[in-house]
């Protein structure tokens, strides 16, 4: 029951405040740990494809497990003091694990410009949430780009964290964010990360399989009805 209230409270906090720039975010510290492990393991392990894959596998073990154990220990500590403190820390971390407010704001900006039939403004609005050139998009193209991007980001920014929260509270949600952050930093198919990022990328694929499949299915249904 406490997990339910932690998730609900976290969702409300995210809807109201989003991610204030002045507030330290766990993902920032996760990124620092990933960078440290990347540098350190490359120095220690053989500079071969196999050595790099081992380094990536070690990173893919240390960060998620460490995140879960550390956040779980902090939650346990606060619950031992009083259940209210435990609930509050879980609510806070649940809110930080979500990215719903920013996603809703940006997608609504696109919708408003489309409603006004202002194509240049709609292109500009959608350019803030997609990673490709939008200058040549039609009204239909802008709509499809927005739906596809919202579906993709809803999967790893809302649906997956919520699912993790309901199963394992804030510690599991933060663990998911750690996996997602690893993929964002290491999951490139270039010379530097093709081997080191292999296991982190596979782990992210596994963690996202159910939530992303669901959101892509819903997005496909939406696009078919346009």
Language-model features and meaning:
Residues 14, 215-222:
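Conserved small/polar residues in nucleotide/adenosyl-binding loops
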Residues 26-44, 125, 146, 150, ...:
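Hydrophobic alpha-helical segments of integral membrane proteins
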Residues 2-76:
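N-terminal transmembrane signal-anchor/hairpin module of polytopic inner-membrane proteins
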Residues 6-21, 86-112:
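Hydrophobic alpha-helical membrane-embedded segments
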Residues 2, 67-83, 163-176:
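Juxtamembrane "helix exit" motif at the C-terminal ends of alpha-helical transmembrane segments
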Residues 97-99, 158-176, 210-217:
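Hydrophobic, aromatic-rich membrane-embedded alpha-helical segments
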Residues 10-19, 175-207:
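Acidic (Asp/Glu-rich) catalytic motifs at the cytosolic membrane interface
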Residues 102-170, 181-191, 198, 221:
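Polar-ligand-bearing catalytic/cofactor-coordination segments
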């Amino acid at each position: 029951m406490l997990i339910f209230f932690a998730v609900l409270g976290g969702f409300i906090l995210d809807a109201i405040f989003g991610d204030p720039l002045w507030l330290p975010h766990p993902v920032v510290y996760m990124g620092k740990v990933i960078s440290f492990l990347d540098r350190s393991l490359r120095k220690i392990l053989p500079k071969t494809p196999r050595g790099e894959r081992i380094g990536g596998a070690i990173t893919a073990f240390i960060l998620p497990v460490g995140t879960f154990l550390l956040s779980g220990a902090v939650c346990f500590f606060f619950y031992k003091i009083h259940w209210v403190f435990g609930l509050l820390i879980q609510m806070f971390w649940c809110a930080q694990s979500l990215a719903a407010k920013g996603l809703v704001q940006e997608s609504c900006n696109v919708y408003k410009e489309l409603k006004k039939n202002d194509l240049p403004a709609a292109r500009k609005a959608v350019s803030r949430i997609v990673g490709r050139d939008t200058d040549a998009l039609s009204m239909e193209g802008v709509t499809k780009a927005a739906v596809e991007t919202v579906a993709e980001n809803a999967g790893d920014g809302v649906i997956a964290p919520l699912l993790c929260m309901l199963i394992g509270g804030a510690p599991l949600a933060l663990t998911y964010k750690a996996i997602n952050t690893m993929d964002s930093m290491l999951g490139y198919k270039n010379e530097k990360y093709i081997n080191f990022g292999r296991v982190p990328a596979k782990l992210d694929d596994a963690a996202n399989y159910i939530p992303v499949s669901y959101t892509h299915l819903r997005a496909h249904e939406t696009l078919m009805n346009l």
